From Swiss-Prot:
Record family assignment: Belongs to the DapA family.
Gene name linked to the record: dapA
Stored SUPFAM superfamilies: Aldolase
One Pfam family here: DHDPS
Protein name: 4-hydroxy-tetrahydrodipicolinate synthase
Active site feature: 144 (proton donor/acceptor), 172 (schiff-base intermediate with substrate)
Lineage summary: Bacteria, Bacillati, Cyanobacteriota, Cyanophyceae, Synechococcales
UniProt entry tagged with the keyword Repeat: no
UniProt subunit comment: Homotetramer; dimer of dimers.
Cell compartment(s), UniProt: Cytoplasm
Species this chain originates from: Prochlorococcus marinus (strain SARG / CCMP1375 / SS120)
Length: 302
């Protein structure tokens, strides 16, 4: 039986931003704005950036757009933060190709979502992720479980079976429950770095063994999130809880409708006009935008 090496507690840092994809008024990717936004997010506390994930609207980006975004963001941050590429697909061959391409392009890691729509059984999920891992053996991978989007969930037992793939080093937990973190910790221990995939559950997930977060809210309150994480790991639990409670209204507002619709509107409100989402997503309705503005204004006063 192979010996699986231990990994560092947070291989990509503790605060990762699932970065939006900026579009111009014609709906084309605004690569220059993506570069500026990437540098801003790092300045606001992000240890890593994930391009072309759910928040980055990967379903409506071509593979060529995704590869160019990866290159753009990597060049923009110039080693000051980890850059991960979303390379998941419900086609194993597509995921293999995209992950290998990300490795060739110099990504620091890849976010690989559970295959969506076709609902493979657990054996199929194991085979899928094993094949992707073997296609880019030197690229660290983060598995991504978000059953509300994919219609399918990878079980902790299946993840445990994948632990002999040495480059599967982390897991984005977005099932909406802390139980997933506990079950993974029991089965995989410190071998697997678990990241909260839900801003609102970050503090509870840290308390049961998560190492950090893949955040949407960090587009708006990166330094506040960083402060909460640092307070928690410094043992300042009351301070961490205070941050958690103060940020809850924003967390809820950013998921009042489908992500990334609200966060794109929020970015515009704070001076980053990143464009509307691509169809079939729509811009945030005016009433919800007004409520979002009130939430952000109130938060900035605390």
């Amino acid at each position: 039986m192979s010996t699986v090496p231990e990994i560092s507690s947070a291989p990509f840092g503790r605060l990762l931003t699932a970065m939006v994809t900026p579009f111009d008024t014609a709906g084309a990717v605004d690569f220059a704005l993506a570069a500026r936004l990437a540098r801003y997010l790092v300045d606001q506390g992000s240890d890593g950036l994930i391009v072309c994930g759910t928040t980055g609207e990967s379903p409506t980006l071509s593979w060529e757009e995704q590869y160019q975004l990866l290159e753009t963001v990597r060049n923009a941050v110039n080693g000051s933060a980890k850059v991960l590429a979303g390379t998941g697909s419900n086609s194993t061959s597509e995921a293999i190709h995209a992950t290998a391409k990300a490795a060739e392009a110099g990504a620091d890691g890849a976010l690989v979502v559970v295959p969506y729509y076709n609902k493979p059984p657990q054996a199929g999920l194991e085979s899928h992720f094993r094949a992707v891992a073997q296609a880019a053996p030197d690229l660290p991978l983060m598995l991504y479980n978000i059953p509300g989007r994919t219609g399918c969930s990878i079980s902790p037992i299946t993840v445990q079976r994948l632990m002999n793939c040495s480059n599967i080093v982390s897991f984005k937990a977005a099932s909406g429950t802390t139980n997933e973190v506990t079950d993974l910790r029991i089965r995989c221990g410190s071998r697997l770095a678990i990241y909260s995939g839900d801003d609102g559950l970050l503090l509870p997930m840290l308390s049961v063994g998560a190492v950090g977060v893949v955040s949407v809210a960090s587009h708006i309150v990166g330094m506040r999130l960083k402060a909460m994480i640092e307070a928690y790991f410094a043992g300042e639990n009351s301070l961490a809880l205070s941050h958690h409670e103060q940020l809850q209204p924003l967390f809820k507002a950013l998921f009042a409708t489908t992500n990334p619709i609200p966060v794109k509107a929020a970015l515009e409100l704070i001076g980053w006009p990143v464009g509307a989402p691509r169809s079939p997503l729509l811009p945030l309705e005016n009433q919800m935008k007004n409520e979002l503005m009130k939430t952000i204004s109130a938060l900035l006063q605390t």
